[in-house]
Curated annotation (Swiss-Prot):
Belongs to the ThrE exporter (TC 2.A.79) family. It comes from Shigella boydii serotype 4 (strain Sb227). This is Probable succinate transporter subunit YjjB. Involved in succinate export with YjjP. Both proteins are required for export. One of its GO terms (cellular component) is plasma membrane. Its main location: membrane. GO terms for biological process: succinate transport. It is a multi-pass membrane protein. Keywords: Cell inner membrane, Cell membrane, Membrane, Transmembrane, Transmembrane helix, Transport. Pfam families: ThrE_2. The gene is yjjB. The chain crosses the membrane at residues 8-28, 57-77, 87-107, 129-149.
Amino acid sequence: MGVIEFLFALAQDMILAAIPAVGFAMVFNVPVRALRWCALLGAIGHGSRMILMTRGLNIEWSTFMASMLVGTIGIQWSRWYLAHPKVFTVAAVIPMFPGISAYTAMISAVKISQLGYSEPLMITLLTNFLTASSIVGALSIGLSIPGLWLYRKRPRV
């Protein structure tokens, strides 16, 4: 993939990630003045995850690093705009949730219950379930670590 194609794919990924970020921000009753920042933060998070995955990092670690970036930027923006960091960060990480792997795991579980046990279905179920669980864990831990670092009152050493 050339540089121009990568930049177009990155721009498309960021634009398509901003749409659900704004949608979920509206569901969470985020103030109207913060909607554009939720969209931008969702685009930054999903774009950074795509860059890290393109560079060879797996999806779990890429999601962890991207959610740490989202958490750090969200804390800084909350200081600038006098809002809680969750106003910006929660809606911004929703586009990174593992919908496809969770859905595939669920479908595999339904097929096992209907058709009976088979090793390929069980492998598909466990692989996708563990991937989805790891991504959700990476999102939650990565989103909470910047708050632990930046709001710490005691010295680190």
